[in-house]
């Protein structure tokens, strides 16, 4: 779906993400800018090579510069590891705040992972409540130093 429409998160995982944004954070998805670290899908949906991520980095930086978000949410392993400049597993990064280019950033599981592991939905809901609290004015506890 994402490839044919050229828009991230429009398939089943995207529909789940929309419900979570609107029901937990309580803002319309239309007020959330969603982009991918990698700007195209690797062949056969394989994991991206570091060189592929490096090629896309300037585009991501420009997107973030233009949008100037209050908070960034890193969905999944590759986004979290890239934004936090670490190879720490997503299970250890999930639910933790850091800063990317001075912007408060939180890592959580990717919605596609939740489609395969529904038992993890509760922890992601907890992460989204942390995001809501920060958007409502709470100070995040920065735990990941990047």
Regions found by a protein language model. Give the residues of each.
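A polyanion-binding, active-site-adjacent surface
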Residues: 1-146
